[in-house]
């Protein structure tokens, strides 16, 4: 809104022209979303501590160190999502269909996560919403987002899929693209949700992935100014406005991380993890970086696969467990790794995956 207002008055004040620059607005978005998130979270902590029945329930089967976390407030994702939306609407072009679609998807999944969190804390169990109802809701939101994106993308690339590390190789999935895009968005949402199990664990990877996606959105939109022949990327007009949104995610997550580093004063909750995971999934679909998301977000993939493998192993191999506990970060807890050691190692893995993903732009 602020961006649109200032641009409309560019003739009366030349200095407003700097707001044409996506990089300038992205930098401001980081600072603004950080400030809002950093300021709002202490208020949430105070409020949720006052209402003690809104504390995070702890699984009885979890590591014994988690018992000390009983009573820690949850639903900190409220502050993150609020900060992102306010910053994005102020500094991005709010008429941009890709921005609006991502905000719609993120907000819808945040509401779903909020309902899930509320059921968990009020009923004092870790199950929340029925899994089938949650999945159906995610599918409905994802279908709407995919249809909007597919309709607005250039028809020459709408159903195309980039294969990283294979120069100029794209595959036209045709009618199978929408189901594939649904898998990316829903999978991303749930994978991030599964990763959110230790203090600070999911926040830094979200920041790293958002940075990579923001960069790729900028490159995708500015292909005419870059020697696109040397980059494995498709030209997506108006995608650079999503760089502002990605920057807002970075800033809001940094503000949250201040209070979420061990020992955490507040947890993100499903309201944050489901929506942020969904947002990066939607952005990857818009910018045509679906497979590349699986690389830069490799940590999320590993966490999700470990949970899937464990479930199928128990169900079809006579109760045999591949891991001591899933997702995999809990496995490392069970074999004696400290929480800080697991988190720091997983952060390093996330950095490595992001570097591999970015290298696929030029290799």
Swiss-Prot record:
Keyword Membrane belongs to the record: yes
Localization annotation: Cell inner membrane
TM region positions: 4-24, 28-48, 72-92, 96-116, 129-149, 169-189, 200-220, 241-261, 266-286, 294-314, 342-362
InterPro entries with a match to the protein in the record: Glycosyl_transferase_4, PNAcMuramoyl-5peptid_Trfase, PNAcMuramoyl-5peptid_Trfase_CS
Record's keyword terms, sorted: Cell cycle, Cell division, Cell inner membrane, Cell membrane, Cell shape, Cell wall biogenesis/degradation, Magnesium, Membrane, Metal-binding, Peptidoglycan synthesis, Transferase, Transmembrane, Transmembrane helix
GO MF annotation terms: metal ion binding; phospho-N-acetylmuramoyl-pentapeptide-transferase activity; UDP-N-acetylmuramoyl-L-alanyl-D-glutamyl-meso-2,6-diaminopimelyl-D-alanyl-D-alanine:undecaprenyl-phosphate transferase activity
Protein known as: Phospho-N-acetylmuramoyl-pentapeptide-transferase
Species this chain originates from: Orientia tsutsugamushi (strain Ikeda)
Organism placement in taxonomy: Bacteria, Pseudomonadati, Pseudomonadota, Alphaproteobacteria, Rickettsiales
């Amino acid at each position: 809104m602020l961006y649109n207002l200032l641009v409309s008055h560019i003739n009366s004040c030349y200095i407003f022209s700097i707001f044409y620059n996506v990089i300038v607005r992205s930098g401001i978005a980081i600072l603004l979303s950080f400030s809002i998130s950093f300021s709002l979270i202490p208020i949430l902590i105070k409020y949720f501590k006052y209402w003690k029945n809104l504390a995070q329930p702890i699984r009885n089967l979890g590591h014994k160190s988690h018992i000390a976390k009983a009573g820690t407030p949850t639903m900190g994702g409220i502050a993150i999502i609020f900060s992102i939306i306010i910053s994005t609407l102020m500094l991005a072009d709010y008429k941009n269909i890709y921005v609006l679609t991502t905000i719609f998807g993120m907000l819808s999944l945040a509401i779903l996560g909020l309902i899930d969190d509320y059921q968990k804390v009020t009923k004092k169990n870790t199950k929340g919403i029925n899994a089938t109802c949650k999945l159906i809701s995610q599918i409905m939101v994802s279908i709407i987002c995919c249809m909007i994106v597919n309709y607005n993308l250039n028809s020459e690339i709408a159903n195309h899929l980039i294969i990283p590390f294979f120069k100029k190789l794209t595959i036209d999935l045709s009618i199978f693209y929408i189901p594939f895009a649904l898998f990316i968005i829903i999978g991303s949402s749930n994978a991030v949700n599964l990763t959110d199990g230790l203090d600070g664990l999911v926040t830094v990877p979200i920041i790293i992935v958002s940075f990579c996606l923001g960069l790729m959105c900028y490159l995708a939109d500015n292909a005419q100014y870059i020697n696109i022949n040397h980059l494995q990327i498709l030209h997506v007009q108006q995608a650079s406005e999503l760089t502002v949104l990605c920057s807002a995610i970075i800033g809001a997550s940094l503000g949250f991380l201040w209070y979420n580093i061990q020992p955490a004063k507040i947890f993100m909750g499903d309201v944050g993890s489901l929506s942020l995971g969904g947002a990066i999934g939607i952005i990857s679909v818009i910018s045509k970086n679906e497979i590349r998301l699986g690389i830069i977000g490799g940590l999320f993939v590993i966490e999700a696969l470990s949970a899937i493998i464990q479930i199928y192993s128990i169900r079809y191999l006579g109760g045999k467990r591949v891991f001591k506990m899933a997702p995999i970060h809990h496995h490392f807890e069970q074999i004696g790794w400290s929480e800080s050691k697991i988190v720091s190692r997983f952060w390093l893995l996330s950095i490595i995956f992001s570097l591999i993903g970015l290298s696929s732009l030029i290799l």
